[in-house]
Amino acid sequence: MESYLNENFDVKAKHSSEEVLEKWRNLCGVVKNPKRRFRFTANLSKRYEAAAMRRTNQEKLRIAVLVSKAAFQFISGVSPSDYTVPEDVKAAGFEICADELGSIVESHDVKKLKFHGGVDGLAGKLKASPTDGLSTEAAQLSQRQELFGINKFAESEMRGFWVFVWEALQDMTLMILGVCAFVSLIVGIATEGWPKGSHDGLGIAASILLVVFVTATSDYRQSLQFRDLDKEKKKITVQVTRNGFRQKLSIYDLLPGDIVHLAIGDQVPADGLFLSGFSVVIDESSLTGESEPVMVNAQNPFLMSGTKVQDGSCKMMITTVGMRTQWGKLMATLTEGGDDETPLQVKLNGVATIIGKIGLFFAVVTFAVLVQGMFMRKLSTGTHWVWSGDEALELLEYFAIAVTIVVVAVPEGLPLAVTLSLAFAMKKMMNDKALVRHLAACETMGSATTICSDKTGTLTTNHMTVVKSCICMNVQDVANKGSSLQSEIPESAVKLLIQSIFNNTGGEVVVNKHGKTELLGTPTETAILELGLSLGGKFQEERKSYKVIKVEPFNSTKKRMGVVIELPEGGRMRAHTKGASEIVLAACDKVVNSSGEVVPLDEESIKYLNVTINEFANEALRTLCLAYMDIEGGFSPDDAIPASGFTCVGIVGIKDPVRPGVKESVELCRRAGITVRMVTGDNINTAKAIARECGILTDDGIAIEGPVFREKNQEELLELIPKIQVMARSSPMDKHTLVKQLRTTFDEVVAVTGDGTNDAPALHEADIGLAMGIAGTEVAKESADVIILDDNFSTIVTVAKWGRSVYINIQKFVQFQLTVNVVALVVNFSSACLTGSAPLTAVQLLWVNMIMDTLGALALATEPPNDELMKRLPVGRRGNFITNAMWRNILGQAVYQFIVIWILQAKGKAMFGLDGPDSTLMLNTLIFNCFVFCQVFNEISSREMEEIDVFKGILDNYVFVVVIGATVFFQIIIIEFLGTFASTTPLTITQWIFSIFIGFLGMPIAAGLKTIPV
């Protein structure tokens, strides 16, 4: 079976081709309810339709943008037609309406923008300040929202409970049974009268309704869970200035006139206009289909919702929100194609198909044998031409039994149990600070063999402080020095440092609404800004003193950032750079000495500074070098900042402590067979020191630098990669190469963390991409499969534990369900062949189906993870889903149950002294009761596939306890009180004890089976 499944039902967790997805669906036969079974799989036809629609819309948008841009270059003399402000807008105090605002950005209408007075003019008409933003007065915000709309897209309506009831009724076998129930009701009443003749028909109808409502309730609850998770995925916050104060705001609360701050990796949250910024490059491919990035500046100020900031940073003013934006219109035209199905869902569809075909064969044969037996009886009595109502009902019962065998034999619950388990796990993982974006990721994480983790913020706290410095060639402890540090540095050097720190930064020092000073920016930036403040610097004064000519933001390839400013005295230009110590120091040829003088950087000074860098790094400090140069001969914003000729001002050592619990988590991974590798852009000595502290770098492991790794050929990589535990000074492409090699060459299942825009390729390539929720950019999050909301490595280990739990829970459920399938099939088939009757009726089989399908999935697929899971080796990429241990347990239990039921069938009447007209009914009730209790105790045994102690932690899973309790309770009701509908009769106390004992006996047998090696 496994080889057939691997050949035909094997899909990748990510990036499966449409052909592969089509192939397995076409192989799925004997599907009782396609609507329900394939609800959580990608709708390929809608996906094709959506893709075609997207291409059409992108082409329209692309042409519109290009035509408008070209037209405005040539048509300079034409003025826009007069604009009349609508009365309701005028009454509210605004001078422009939403439609006019929308047309400006949508058409890139420069003429119309100029007509309204440019960006400042529009701000005035919107009653907004380009510096202070909107007023936070509730009445004004409400009025603005009423006139200009909210920043939300149209969503499909939530499907109600009755929709799921209707879907459950689409089951073909239940429809056939419904027809059987109706015919049985009519014939029964006609022959036996009311109410006696209605019992069989009403029994089947009631069973169908029970199955439908339990199924619908389960599906509806799942849909609510997915809805909640979908809302979590869409929660995006942006930095906004309102009332003159910077604050975080949900994108849903944005309004026209809001001032939004954007940086690399951010998604533009609504249509708007550029206010100020540097080197802003926008990726518009998601909207227009154009792969060429667009420069946005004062000349081309249009920013469109849904596009991504590829480089630079800026302030923008929102003009159009929600369904009025280009992105909103595009989203409204697209139909959701759905998430790709997970590998387990597909594999279990394969299992369901195989068993379904076997079940269909047995059902047909069983029906044929039962009918043949009936005809033989009638032939022997010579009544084959005469048919009574009772005989018609008997024939109908045979048909119902055959159909119900198909109901039981086609395990449609298998693939749906995966969804149930994943929904449960995803909801619980939210509480553990992990947001799963793609279903398959949760499942795949259970098979992970390698985690490639960032250092900063994941293994460390990301709370950074400058603790050491080497300024003007003097090493000093900065921590706890405060303002006294200023007096120990030459005044000229202090001025240079403050100038460098406050001008060459992506952060800001602001006063919040409570009147307190607040540092904004990345942890590295805020640590450096804190140093600038301790040196006596004043951020706003410093920024106003100099005109910024050019900014080159930090990126992980260059590993440095730069700025060119115009000095007030004489208009001279000065460049400042800051970044990785070795890289910036290599660009220096001069240094500021202890007297504050600029002197040539000789060999001795270089050696001293390199030793200092290594000493800082060996103390697990991140090191940054600050340098400057005076530019002679003028500088244009189009020029690149010089790459060399700088003067080194100083080196700072930043402490970023290791997170508590990381060392234990790394050790837990090692015991679980998961290799943890650190991939960082930091200095190799810093990386090694942190890696040793975390327990990642061992004596036999290798630490390597990205540039060295890049130079290796394939043969060298084959030997090197298994030993790599630390990669320092790595670029995003180094990370991508490492991940690709691990996956393709070494067949590892790789999880990768990332937070920056440049990490997107590695996150996309990995089996599981893990983006950081706090430090991560929107681009990184969009490329990821799981978002680690607290940026903590220990949370990644929790995700792995949940992934293993999902995988093993599904294995438990499959083992349990296949046992019921095998026994129910064999018992009814063999009984039909040998005795001419079936001991389990249609109503009874429907009840068994519910125990095994919906209730069984609820009980076994929602087991919470335990610590034992992380003591096993990972399944890896090639592991068999249905293991030898599972086959051993399935066949062992099936043989036991089959033997018990056959002994009862053959000797039951004699054993219990049953005689009289109701003896067969009594025996069949006893067989049914024993069969159900065998499933109840087998369900408990299935909690562990290898361990003998199956009661450990049973009370931690209240769902399991409730399901077992409910099953026993309803079984008592069915036997004792619903006999006329379920074809049962009340049992004696002795018979009840015997039934429970027979079921319980399966547990020691299951424990004994687990001792058999496989």
Swiss-Prot record:
Example GO molecular function: ATP binding
Region (Interaction with calmodulin): 20-31
Keyword Endoplasmic reticulum attributed: yes
Record PTM Phosphoserine, positions in chain: 45
Side of membrane Cytoplasmic, spans: 1-160, 221-348, 417-810, 862-881, 939-956, 1011-1014
Positions annotated as active site in the UniProt record: 454 (4-aspartylphosphate intermediate)
EC number(s) stated in the UniProt entry for this protein: 7.2.2.10
Major location category of this protein: endoplasmic reticulum
UniProt-listed PROSITE patterns: ATPASE_E1_E2
Compartment annotation: Endoplasmic reticulum membrane
Pfam families, per the entry: CaATP_NAI, Cation_ATPase, Cation_ATPase_C, Cation_ATPase_N, E1-E2_ATPase, Hydrolase
Catalytic activity annotation: Ca(2+)(in) + ATP + H2O = Ca(2+)(out) + ADP + phosphate + H(+)
Keyword Acyltransferase included in the entry's annotation: no
Topology of the protein relative to the lipid bilayer: Multi-pass membrane protein
Membrane-traversing stretches: 161-181, 200-220, 349-368, 399-416, 811-829, 841-861, 882-904, 917-938, 957-978, 989-1010
UniProt remark on domains: The N-terminus contains an autoinhibitory calmodulin-binding domain, which binds calmodulin in a calcium-dependent fashion.
Function: This magnesium-dependent enzyme catalyzes the hydrolysis of ATP coupled with the translocation of calcium from the cytosol into the endoplasmic reticulum.
Protein name (Swiss-Prot/TrEMBL): Calcium-transporting ATPase 2, plasma membrane-type
